[in-house]
Amino acid sequence: MANHLLEEMVDALSSLPGIGRKSAFRISFHLLRLEQGHFNHFIHQLTNTKNKIKFCKRCGSYAETEICNICTSEKRDTHTFCVVEQPEDIFFIENTREFHGKYHVLNGVISPLEGIGPKDLRIKELLERIEPEQIKEVLVATNPTLEGDATADYLASQLKPLSVDVTRIAYGITVGGSIELADQYTLGRAIRSRLQL
C-alpha cells in the first residue's frame, strides 16, 4: 500500500482483539470519511474514557470512582459473590439479569505454562473480603478451559475452610445446538453438570 499513514492506522486497528485487517481497513476508511467535528468527538470520547476509567478498589471491575456502582449498590445481594477472570466478564453476566450479588475480579487464571500462579491473581484480596462482608456463597465463573477449571478447583480448596458455599457456573450444549456438533470436552462437561428434572 502506498499510503503509509493509512497503513499505520490499519496496523493499529488490527491490533485490537476481533478486528482483522479487512475490518481495520473498513473502519479506517469510515473514520477518514467522518465530518471533522464528529471525528473529534469520537477521539475525545475514547481519550476521556481511557483517562477516567479506573479499577474498583474493592472488586477490581472498571469504575469511574474508587468503588464501582455494583459494590456500593444497596439493591444487590451482599452475601453472594461471583468470581470472574476479567472485568469485562461482569458486563456479560450482568446482561443476563440472572445474577444479583456482587463481584470479584481475579485478573486472570492460574496458568503454570505462562508462569501465572495463585499469588499473581487477586485471590488473597478475595479471601480477605469473605469474613468482613459475611459472604455465604461464591459462584466461580471462570471460563471452561483447563486453566479456568484449575483456578476454580484452587478457589474451592481455599474457600471451603471458610464455611462458604462454592458453586460453579454450569457448562454444556448451547441452546439450539446439536449433540453431534459438540466437542468431547463440552459434551462430557454437560453430562457431568446434568440437572434433576
UniProtKB/Swiss-Prot annotation:
NCBIfam families: recR. This is Recombination protein RecR. Coiled coil: none annotated. HAMAP family: RecR. Keywords: DNA damage, DNA recombination, DNA repair, Metal-binding, Zinc, Zinc-finger. GO terms for molecular function: DNA binding; zinc ion binding. The keyword Signal does not apply. The keyword Nucleotide-binding does not apply. Belongs to the RecR family. A zinc finger (C4-type) spans 56-71. It comes from Leptospira borgpetersenii serovar Hardjo-bovis (strain JB197). CDD domains: TOPRIM_recR. GO terms for biological process: DNA recombination; DNA repair. May play a role in DNA repair. It seems to be involved in an RecBC-independent recombinational process of DNA repair. It may act with RecF and RecO. Residues 79-174 form the Toprim domain. Signal peptide: none annotated.
